[in-house]
Amino acid sequence: MGQKINPIGLRIGVIKDWQSNWYADKNYTELVHEDIKIREYIENKLFNADVSAIQIDRAANRIKVTLHTAKPGMVIGKGGSGVEKLRSDIENLTGKKVHINVMEVKTPELDAHLAAKSIAIALERRVAFRRAMKQAVGRAMRQGAKGIKVMCSGRLGGAEMSRTEWYTEGNVPLQTLRADIDYGMVEANTAYGQIGVKCWINKGEVLPEVDENEETKEENKEKSEEKSE
């Protein structure tokens, strides 16, 4: 299943967290649709700001939106005018109080969504697909990725028959739950039709935190067993 399922969804509750954090007993479907509208609005409005993730938290009638972006200056705007305009637009869209946080993505080369987006933009500019894939893989590996896998699917190079091409470097263990695998999927709109771009980036293993009290208990247990022997 690790080869087919979304690797972020597979790791939720293990090393990944939900991108929408809230609970609703009633009006659940309305809130889900509201989340979708917020995400679509932000993605369309801030397309050039390289937004990699949108996290939504709710409490009562307040919404907290956290934007992870490689270009925070473009989101915030001059004197905060950009983020203020965005906040008022989302408030008009939802009819609720909105607070916006902007988080900078320090290494966009290691963000799977932004890597896939860079390949998609290159394909739309008629760059050869192998060259676009190879450049994205090289950038990620230079920034310290343990492994990266890229897939392009569609009428590559304007061919009459669609096909799928892969480019892999390093190690990408999809079934290892402690492996921090980032995943992104973007569609490129070319003159020959849509090309799907998928990207998996392995950032290394995330080991569970060991509780110091539990660690000392284990040590004491081992010492007592040694004495009894």
Curated annotation (Swiss-Prot):
GO BP annotation list: translation
CDD domains according to UniProt: KH-II_30S_S3
SMART domains, alphabetized: KH
Signal peptide annotation: none
Keywords for this protein: Ribonucleoprotein, Ribosomal protein, RNA-binding, rRNA-binding
Bias-annotated ranges (Basic and acidic residues): 218-229
Gene3D superfamilies, A to Z: 3.30.300.20, Ribosomal protein S3, C-terminal domain
GO molecular function terms attached to this record: mRNA binding; rRNA binding; structural constituent of ribosome
Any one cellular-component term (Gene Ontology): cytosolic small ribosomal subunit
Sequence ranges assigned to domain KH type-2 in this UniProt record: 38-106
Biased composition (Acidic residues): 208-217
Region (Disordered), start-end ranges: 208-229
Domain of life: Bacteria
Function statement: Binds the lower part of the 30S subunit head. Binds mRNA in the 70S ribosome, positioning it for translation.
Family statement: Belongs to the universal ribosomal protein uS3 family.
PANTHER family from the UniProt entry: 30S/40S RIBOSOMAL PROTEIN S3 (PTHR11760), SMALL RIBOSOMAL SUBUNIT PROTEIN US3C (PTHR11760:SF19)
HAMAP family named in the record: Ribosomal_uS3_B
Assembly behavior: Part of the 30S ribosomal subunit. Forms a tight complex with proteins S10 and S14.
Name assigned to this protein: Small ribosomal subunit protein uS3
Lineage: Bacteria, Bacillati, Bacillota, Clostridia, Natranaerobiales
